[in-house]
């Protein structure tokens, strides 16, 4: 069952261009280094907040990624632009059209 990581964070307005520049390298590092990484979407919210929606093939893939942290330069550069972690959640994506 696909696992969805929801991470909400705050970025100071002057840091937004650097965050967006770092995103490409972060995603490249995820594709190269994170087994089970499927997709990521970045959403801008009010009050200088952002929501990163990342889809993993399995919960174990997400857990392994979390354990690695910012182990590569592109990931570290993206994380460096974050002023504050607001919240983080994990959920599952149910099959469409199936009960349960």
Go through each PLM region and give its residues.
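Generic low-complexity segments that are intrinsically disordered, proline-rich and/or Lys/Arg-biased
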Residues: 47, 74, 95-96
């Amino acid at each position: 069952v696909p696992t969805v990581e929801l991470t909400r964070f705050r970025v100071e307005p002057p840091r937004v261009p650097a965050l967006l520049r770092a995103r490409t390298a972060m995603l490249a590092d995820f594709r190269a280094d994170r087994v089970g990484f499927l997709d990521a979407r970045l959403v801008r919210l009010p009050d200088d907040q952002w929501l990163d929606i990342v889809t993993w093939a399995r919960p174990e893939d997400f857990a392994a990624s979390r354990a690695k942290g910012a182990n590569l330069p592109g990931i570290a550069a993206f994380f460096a632009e974050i002023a504050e972690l607001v919240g983080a959640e994990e959920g599952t994506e149910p099959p469409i059209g199936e009960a349960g």
